[in-house]
Regions:
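Intrinsically disordered, low-complexity, positively biased terminal segments
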Residues: 1-16, 70, 149-404
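Hydrophobic, small-residue-rich alpha-helical packing segments that form membrane-like cores
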Residues: 8-13, 23, 48, 93
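Active-site rim helix/loop that mediates acceptor-substrate recognition in acyltransferases
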Residues: 24-70, 183-210
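Conserved beta-strand in the GNAT
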Residues: 49, 55-64, 79, 84, ...
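Conserved acetyl-CoA-binding loop-helix of GNAT-fold acetyltransferases
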Residues: 82-85, 91-104, 246-257
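Conserved active-site alpha-helix within GNAT-family acetyltransferase domains
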Residues: 107-112, 117-138, 272-287
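Glycine-/small-residue-rich beta-strand-loop submotif within the FAD-binding core of flavoenzymes
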Residues: 137-151
Length: 404
């Protein structure tokens, strides 16, 4: 419960200096980067300051986005960002007040899901966010790796261009591709500035971005210089690799692997990235899997019908949601031909789960059968968890390449 001395309101331009200082303190960030980077994307009517008297002690914002869900459909999502509490004011209910304000606002406006990146993994499940809604795979691989003989590489020329030349093409390609990739988000102009910020403070000792265009895709990367008695040992740090076709994907990876003077490539990608099955020795590829998006079902009856499902099912779900009580209770969830109908019911429950477990499974990356084994899902009618698992599972692992 929030401290009764606290208040919450939306921000205006005059709040920005103090708002950014609180963010920098909480994230242990460089205030120079916070001022002009993250604040560019904030929507003032959806950004909140939590105050103790006149002092801002907490921050939070919601970005209006679309997320691609199974079936290639676009669903409005509240992308929760810059959630901070000023040191010295923890355990006063600051985060609870912010979360309640955000989620109740999304419910009233009809935004069916909320998403966020969690800086600390123990915080958000209690607010109904499901972990591992998407996963993020950090890969490192040595250059000069060969593809197996079945991978075609075309002679298409990949052009190295300026940022100004690249951006119009990249915007168009990204918007087409993100509509086909589960977990990808829409972008507004300010998002491009954040994702590809290229001031000195953004580079962490690396070079400025290189922009390389294929007719059906692009790659953006920085270089970390290195070397010694054995010669150059530069590293390529890929920021984005976006492709409309499998051929462009193979061509761009081959381009990166063959860059002179580089010895290693590092990049963040989907858990099921096909590059592991393209190279001739996948054991040389380093992998480090972690959580990415956390997803919160704001309205069960709105969110579940907005995606497509892999098999028919008819189950009664008993959902527990203490933070958004309109979701609590029993729902008949019926899928036929990939489309779902959700309605209140008094029938006995086949499966019980909390709203966070439902959020983890929503994009198809977490199996409800696994959550059952983890004691997060309870089966009352034998066979229903397996049937629901098959319905929710997607044809690919969900992935969100964009931190917000």
């Amino acid at each position: 419960m929030a401290d009764s001395a606290l208040s919450i309101r939306t921000i205006d331009e005059s709040d920005m200096p103090e708002f950014s200082r609180v963010m920098a303190w909480a994230f242990l960030d460089d205030p120079r980067g916070v001022d002009s980077k993250w604040l560019k994307v904030l929507e003032h009517d959806r950004a909140h300051a939590i105050l103790d008297g006149d002092e801002i002690i907490g921050t939070g914002g919601v970005l209006s986005r679309e997320i691609t869900v199974p079936g290639g459909l676009q669903v409005p999502a509240g992308a929760v960002t810059v959630v901070t509490v000023k040191p010295g004011h923890r355990r006063r209910g600051v985060a609870s007040l912010l979360m309640k304000t955000q989620l109740h606002g999304m419910h009233e406006s009809g935004e069916p899901i909320a998403i966020l990146w969690a800086s600390e993994g123990a915080i958000y499940r209690r607010f109904g966010y499901g972990e591992l809604a998407t996963s993020l795979n950090r890969m490192t691989m040595p250059t000069r790796m060969a593809f197996h003989p079945g991978v075609p590489v075309s002679d298409t020329r990949i052009r190295q261009v300026t940022r100004e030349e690249a951006l119009p093409f990249m915007r168009e390609v990204h918007d087409r591709v993100r509509r086909t990739k589960v977990g990808w988000l829409s972008r507004v102009e300010a998002t491009w500035e954040v994702q590809l910020g290229d001031r000195e403070v953004d580079r962490n000792g690396l070079t400025s971005y290189r922009y390389c265009l294929h007719p059906e895709g692009y790659v953006v990367f920085r270089v970390k210089g290195g070397g010694g008695p054995r010669g150059p040992q530069d590293e390529l740090h890929v920021r984005e690799l976006v492709c409309e076709t499998d051929q462009a994907y193979a061509d761009l990876y081959r381009f990166l692997l063959d860059i002179d003077l580089a010895t290693e490539i590092s990049f963040y990608t989907a858990a099921d990235d096909p590059i592991l099955h393209m190279v001739d020795n996948p054991r040389k590829v380093g992998r480090d899997l972690g959580d990415a998006l956390w997803l919160r079902i704001v309205d069960v009856d709105r969110a579940l019908p907005l995606r497509r499902y892999s098999s028919d099912v008819d189950s009664v779900l008993e959902v527990e949601d203490s933070f958004c009580p309109w979701n609590s209770g029993r729902w008949r969830f019926t899928v036929k031909g990939g489309e779902a109908v959700v309605a209140r019911t008094e029938d006995p429950a086949d499966v019980s789960l909390d709203v966070a477990a439902l959020g983890s499974a929503y994009l198809g990356g977490v199996r409800l059968s696994v959550l059952k084994r983890a004691h997060r899902v309870v089966e009352h009618t034998p066979g229903h968890v397996d049937a629901l698992t098959l319905a929710f599972i997607g044809v690919c692992e969900p992935h969100c390449p964009e931190v917000f």
